[in-house]
Amino acid sequence: MYNGVYETDKKVFTGEKFNGKDVKNTLKSDIIKYFTSQGNFVLEKNAEIKDEKTTLKGDQLEYNKNTEIAKSPKAFEIKYDDYDIFGSSGTLDKKTNHLTGNNVLIKSKLNEEFKGDRVDGTLDNMNLDFIGNVSGRIYQDGVPVNFKGDFVRAYFKKDTQGKNQIQRVEIRKNAVIEKEGTTLYSDYLEIQPEKKLVFGKDNTKAVLKDKDGTITTVTSNMMTGNLNTEIVDLVGKVVVVRKDKDKTLNATSTKAKIKNKDNMIELRGNVVVDDGESVITSDEADYNTKTNKLKARGNVFVDYKVNEKKSVTNANQINSGYNKILKK
């Protein structure tokens, strides 16, 4: 250190090119102010506080050696494990590695990303809450999964090498998940990347785009799905709307299964299908989105919109079901 001056009346030590160490933290900066009676360091320009796990950098850092709490009133950067953390201001408890910060962006070496207006959580287990204008990106089998919402809670676990690995992401309020041709909306969405699962409840909606560009929109009370297989199970007040360039199909049911890659929509319970030409009610129905073929089973009733009505109720017809090619 150079140009050190101690002001006895103020109990303040100032200097340049500081490099020092307490029990477990190394501190350095171009300019230092040390308030001896309080144990407070003010590090300015190229400031750094480092221990075995964490490196905190900023243009201005404040550190209390008694509490081991570091504060950054200005922009900061933290390097922890495989993660780089950036923020406009924040506080890091060096004893517990608890971080609170504003306008935070977290990036991993795997190109995963989380950002939000605020963050609150512990770095050691990487269980973090992101609050306000949250967005991020994780990967499933190398394919990006993007998400956003008002609030996100991220859970990590240690892998066999002791590295933190994303285990679960909860997204609340205005939640959106996007992967390739699938977009999910809800008040609550949850991703489990390791199991390749997604779960949604409360005002759920799935929008699926097939290879031909046709859009299928599905709403329900609850949904579970696999983003890799693009199979989505829906329960409660299911509504399906499928639009192509020529027509729209509307369907409702109690439950449904969307098999997007197999071009199949399976409707179960109190099924009603309106293809524009007729309204078909049944206990079950399978709709092939590629062939436009609908197969209905169990208590089938067809109401043609040209006022021709046909009830399909005898035993043979119920067993064989009802088949119709839905014209484009």
Model-assigned labels for residue ranges:
Residues 1-328:
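Mature-chain termini and adjacent capping regions
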